[in-house]
């Protein structure tokens, strides 16, 4: 039995569809329910279309939260998920950059996450920098711990030079 067949046979998964702006299926991701090896398996169906979970259902006239994982996006109103750390495709979405609030996982020691946050600040995006009192890694964990995630995000969203200064104090890499 191949490894992929073994993964699907032995581990239950939640299948989440990705649609494009026109409501056409562009891919799916399969999330492990037990959190074992290969937490996410993603299959892209159409080339040239960024995989953005929830893009087909956001209100483009309101602020849009951009998070890493599809599960995290379900805890916020008007949110999309990039699936992992592929935030580099935001400029291809046709969404108004000023309406986007980029919400990375709370990983101040992760060099890749730090690079991506720095890049998004340089590109002029609104970014969330989690307060040091938050120890949970992602929105899902924060909600389970009883945090008011919407308020924390509202109070810790920065852009421009303020974001740059806050980022310098936040990162640990």
Regions from the PLM with identified roles:
Residues 106:
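Aromatic/basic micro-patches that form nucleic-acid/chromatin recognition or nuclease catalytic surfaces
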Residues 1-99, 112-114:
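Phosphate-handling DNA/RNA-contact segment within nucleic-acid enzymes
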């Amino acid at each position: 039995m191949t490894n992929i067949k073994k993964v699907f046979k032995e581990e239950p998964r939640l299948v989440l569809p990705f649609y494009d702006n026109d409501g056409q299926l562009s891919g799916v991701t399969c999330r492990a329910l037990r959190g074992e090896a290969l937490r996410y398996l993603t299959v892209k169906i159409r080339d040239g279309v960024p995989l953005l979970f929830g893009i087909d259902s956001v209100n483009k006239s309101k602020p849009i939260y951009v998070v890493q994982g599809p599960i995290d996006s379900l805890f916020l109103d008007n949110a999309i998920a990039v699936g992992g750390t592929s935030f580099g495709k935001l400029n291809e979405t046709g969404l108004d950059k000023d309406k986007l609030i980029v919400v990375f996982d709370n990983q101040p020691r992760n060099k890749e996450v730090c690079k991506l946050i720095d890049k998004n600040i340089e590109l002029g995006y609104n970014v969330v920098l989690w307060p040091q009192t938050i120890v949970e890694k992602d929105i899902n964990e924060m909600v389970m711990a009883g945090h008011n995630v919407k308020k924390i995000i509202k109070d810790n969203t920065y852009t421009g030079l303020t974001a740059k200064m806050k980022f310098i104090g936040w990162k640990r890499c």
